[in-house]
Amino acid sequence: MAGTLKHVTDDSFEQDVLKNDKPVLVDFWAAWCGPCRQIAPSLEAIAAEYGDKIEIVKLNIDENPGTAAKYGVMSIPTLNVYQGGEVAKTIVGAKPKAAIVRDLEDFIAD
């Protein structure tokens, strides 16, 4: 599945994210959001590099407004890391790949 991140929905969020054994980074995004498109290649690269430690998925807020509202996502891109069914970290705004990796250090370190 290289080059494409899994898409989750309001309906699949609990099973795919909250009940996942691994930490899951959820990219809250929308098709009209330029910065969201800018970080997509970085997220795909991080998924390829660290996929054994963290799962990275995308949630389109226009198609799935319920989950975004539930977690208070007010601006995009917002990256939430869920661990054990809870938000463990929130990253707001577009950042370079290296900065995102630094933010994820607690979840991807050996």
Swiss-Prot record:
GO terms for cellular component: cytoplasm; cytosol. Induction: Expressed from 2 promoters, 1 of which (trxBp1) is under control of SigR, and further transiently induced (about 50-fold) by the thiol-oxidizing agent diamide. Part of the trxB-trxA operon. One of its GO terms (biological process) is cell redox homeostasis. The keyword Cytoplasm applies. It is found in: Cytoplasm. It comes from the Bacteria. Residues 2-109 form the Thioredoxin domain. Signal peptide: none annotated. Coiled coil: none annotated. It holds the Pfam family Thioredoxin. Disulfide bonds join 33-36. GO terms for molecular function: protein-disulfide reductase activity. Keywords: Cytoplasm, Disulfide bond, Electron transport, Redox-active center, Transport. Component of the thioredoxin-thioredoxin reductase system. Participates in various redox reactions through the reversible oxidation of its active center dithiol to a disulfide and catalyzes dithiol-disulfide exchange reactions. Stimulates complex formation between sigma factor SigR and its cognate anti-sigma factor RsrA probably by reducing RsrA. PANTHER family: GEO12009P1. Belongs to the thioredoxin family. This is Thioredoxin 1. It comes from Streptomyces coelicolor (strain ATCC BAA-471 / A3(2) / M145).
